[in-house]
């Protein structure tokens, strides 16, 4: 079957397929536009649109029995269904990439114990792409040669070397801007200042507290190179409640308006439970806010996020949240975050992909403390890893990988920095998605600037402020 197969989404099918036939329009369909003018015969030519490109593929595969063939057909149908268009490549023509998604039904022509399968694809992006390549910015300049036949949308990966108020990418015809340049007479300020960065690889500065919400403190917490983990949860105590180890530490300074980031892992196993909690305490040890992730269902793999305000005995606000697609937070390797700015609280939950991108994000809900009940300065943090007695959660299932706390500075009359040393932008001009350290931040884009394509031929791109940024531009050449 060498040279007769295909890949979809840069992966081969779950078993060998042979492409028997394919129908592809070798040139993307062109639809002419005409403008009808009353009183004038006919119409006036008004340019054209490039239509979608359909692809029909006929494949077959081997099976030992009719039932095995039908089972494989079900697997194949599920494998081809994707949320978004993905690269489709035929091994007979490896230099051509189609951004395709399955469309319509899968048709079969059954012969004996097996048969042929017809799969229909649609390419809403009708262009044919070639391989991806990158060009580095050198002292703020990138010379990009686009050998494709049409313009192509670039992806920029930009690393921040020093604090910036703006990021500009431009040519002699177009510009793209994030943030705002600061005139020399304007004040430039940091919106937030990092006051705690604890990798949780050591127990230094951490002590064992005496109280925990809705349960008991027991067992042992250890610091590993991956973060805090529970090696034991303690013997069951009656009446049964949530139990496990907890640790507490002071912040280097008390903080009023703040943001806290806590990356965690909570991996689900059926018939097990698990709970990770982070408390934000005032100087007297009262709980001001608490955020967590938990699996409280012993018969299901199901995680939910939670956010609570106040001590457990007089708590007036409890918020529980599942992902928009409920299983998406299972085997959670992601971020818990708390904001407090003025009297506005906002929790944040997100899975983090291996490439650092935040997905299945929940950040829309917020709470304004009109009664000012939860406004005391934050002086301490407490963490807990717990389970329900009788469930067999193991050490490897739960982990707190670190905690960072920033102080929000009062806005000054001036222009804020939008990024600092070590931050990374990824700007996908094709999708319009902009991420800063994996989080979508389209709000930074200057309203009057535009995403622009790389024209065929030689292109000169400029990156400013070039002494504070480094990066590269990535393109895929394409043709009709």
What feature does the model see in each segment?
Residues 1-194, 267-286, 393-399, 403-480:
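Extracellular/virion structural assembly segments
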Residues 44-46, 108-109, 245-252, 320-328, ...:
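Beta-strand-rich interaction surfaces with strong enrichment in secreted/lumenal proteins
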Residues 83, 255-257, 331-333, 342-344, ...:
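Extracellular Ig-like/FN3 beta-sandwich strand-entry sites
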Residues 193-314, 392-399:
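Secretory/extracellular carbohydrate-interaction modules
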Residues 262, 327-353:
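Short tryptophan-centered beta-strand motifs in secreted/extracellular beta-sheet-rich domains
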Residues 288-300, 336-340, 383, 425-428:
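Broad, structure-driven detector of short, well-ordered beta-strand segments within folded domains
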Residues 304-337:
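Short, aromatic/His-centered strand-loop micro-motif at the edge of beta-sheets
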Residues 359-398:
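Flexible glycan-contacting loops in extracellular carbohydrate-active proteins
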């Amino acid at each position: 079957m060498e040279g007769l197969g295909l890949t979809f989404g840069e992966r081969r099918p779950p078993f060998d397929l042979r492409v028997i036939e394919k129908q592809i329009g070798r040139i993307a369909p062109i639809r002419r536009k005409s403008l009808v003018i009353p009183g004038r015969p006919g119409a006036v030519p008004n340019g054209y649109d490039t239509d979608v490109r359909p692809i029909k593929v006929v494949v077959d595969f081997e099976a030992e029995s009719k039932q095995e063939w039908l089972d494989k057909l079900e697997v194949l149908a599920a494998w081809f269904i994707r949320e978004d268009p993905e690269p489709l490549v035929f091994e007979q023509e490896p230099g051509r990439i189609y951004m395709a998604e399955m469309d319509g039904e899968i048709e079969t022509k059954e012969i004996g114990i097996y048969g042929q399968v017809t799969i229909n694809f649609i390419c809403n992006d009708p262009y044919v792409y070639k391989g991806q390549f990158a060009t580095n910015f050198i002292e703020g300049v990138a010379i990009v040669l686009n050998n494709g036949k049409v313009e192509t949308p670039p992806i920029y990966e930009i690393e921040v070397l020093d604090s910036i108020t703006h990021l500009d990418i431009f040519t002699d015809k177009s510009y793209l801007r994030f943030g705002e340049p600061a005139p020399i007479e304007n004040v430039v300020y940091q919106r937030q200042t990092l006051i705690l960065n604890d990798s949780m690889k050591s127990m230094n500065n951490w002590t064992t507290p005496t109280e925990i919400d809705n349960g008991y403190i027991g067992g042992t917490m250890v610091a590993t190179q991956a973060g805090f983990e529970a090696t034991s949860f303690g013997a069951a105590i009656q009446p049964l409640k949530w139990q496990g180890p907890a640790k507490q530490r002071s912040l280097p300074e008390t903080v009023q308006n703040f943001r806290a980031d806590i990356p965690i892992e909570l991996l689900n196993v059926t018939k097990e439970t698990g709970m990770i909690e982070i408390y934000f305490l005032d100087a007297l040890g009262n709980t001001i806010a608490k955020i967590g992730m938990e699996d409280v269902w012993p018969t299901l793999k199901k995680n939910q996020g939670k956010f609570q305000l106040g001590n457990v005995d007089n708590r007036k606000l409890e918020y529980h949240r599942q992902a928009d697609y409920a299983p998406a937070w299972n085997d959670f390797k992601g971020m818990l975050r708390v904001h407090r700015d003025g009297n506005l609280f906002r929790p944040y939950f997100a899975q983090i992909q291996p490439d650092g991108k935040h997905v299945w994000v929940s950040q829309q809900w917020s709470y304004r403390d009109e009664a000012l009940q939860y406004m005391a300065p934050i002086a301490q943090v407490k963490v807990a890893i717990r389970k329900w007695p009788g469930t067999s959660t193991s050490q490897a299932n739960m982990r707190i990988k670190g905690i960072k706390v920033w102080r929000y500075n009062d806005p000054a009359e001036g222009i804020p920095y939008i990024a600092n040393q070590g931050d990374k932008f990824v700007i996908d001009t094709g999708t319009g998605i902009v991420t800063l350290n994996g989080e979508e931040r389209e709000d930074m884009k200057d309203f009057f600037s535009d995403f622009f394509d790389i024209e065929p031929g030689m292109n000169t791109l400029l990156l400013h402020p070039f002494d504070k940024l480094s990066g590269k531009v990535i393109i895929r050449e394409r043709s009709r």
